[in-house]
């Protein structure tokens, strides 16, 4: 005898599978105690950074993760769970979570970033990394510093020569 599968659950499975398609980072949050307004604000901030947030049923999400070969994440699927995905600059989205953690009851459970399982502590450290723009800016400043010093030295030499003449 075959157990009849609920079509709503199959549909939810397919939607969650699609939700994870093409995403290289997935985060798990405990939203217990958040007001609707706070959760909506979190969702909007995540979407502004090209991420997506969905409240999920843990058992269905476990099956989706297994189907996607994303192992080692079951421990993050306990209690109320919101799943956030990111395509680019996942640490920017992680920064958003930790801003909310400071002022609300939001808890970061863990995540899956570029094929690796991150616990809460590792995600917290990851959220403190500079963004792509900040990294490029830092790199440009490092490159620019010796050139600026050379330009100032040449200018000083030029000024000295002008004084002697």
From Swiss-Prot:
Disulfide bonds: none
A Pfam family it matches: Ribosomal_L10
GO molecular function annotation: large ribosomal subunit rRNA binding
Keyword Methyltransferase: no
Keyword line: Ribonucleoprotein, Ribosomal protein, RNA-binding, rRNA-binding
GO cellular component: ribonucleoprotein complex; ribosome
One of the GO BP terms on file: translation
Domain of life, per lineage: Bacteria
Key word rRNA-binding present: yes
UniProt record similarity statement: Belongs to the universal ribosomal protein uL10 family.
PANTHER family: 39S RIBOSOMAL PROTEIN L10, MITOCHONDRIAL
Assembly description: Part of the ribosomal stalk of the 50S ribosomal subunit. The N-terminus interacts with L11 and the large rRNA to form the base of the stalk. The C-terminus forms an elongated spine to which L12 dimers bind in a sequential fashion forming a multimeric L10(L12)X complex.
HAMAP family xref list: Ribosomal_uL10 (MF_00362)
Stated role: Forms part of the ribosomal stalk, playing a central role in the interaction of the ribosome with GTP-bound translation factors.
Entry protein name: Large ribosomal subunit protein uL10
Taxonomy of the source species: Bacteria, Pseudomonadati, Spirochaetota, Spirochaetia, Spirochaetales
